[in-house]
Amino acid sequence: MVERVYINIMTNIKYGFQPLDAIMTHFSISNSDIVRASTEQLTHKMVQKGRKGCRLNPHIKQKIANALNAAQKEQVFTIRELFNY
């Protein structure tokens, strides 16, 4: 029972606003722009969770990075630059 509660707490950790949020604000890119630019399955909810700092798995982080790079051509961003966890 204690293990189950611990796992639940660990999966709900939020890391605060991520660098992704600041980058999207700087380039005036909305969540809808990211979803539209994505060639993979990506939802508004995934992007919003990424901006707010909810834990995402590495695959979703990569989808968001790919979509952000497709939405703007000025700079190429890596996962490490977009997320601080």
Feature annotation, model-predicted:
Residues 59-76:
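DNA major-groove recognition helix of helix-turn-helix/homeodomain DNA-binding modules
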Residues 2-37:
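A short, Lys/Arg-rich alpha-helix, primarily the initiator
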Residues 40-56:
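Recognition helix of helix-turn-helix/homeodomain-like DNA-binding domains
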Residues 75-85:
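Short amphipathic recognition helices of helix-turn-helix/homeodomain-type DNA-binding modules
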Residues 33-43, 68-71:
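DNA-recognition alpha helix
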Residues 22, 36, 45, 49, ...:
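DNA-binding alpha-helical recognition surfaces that contact promoter or target DNA
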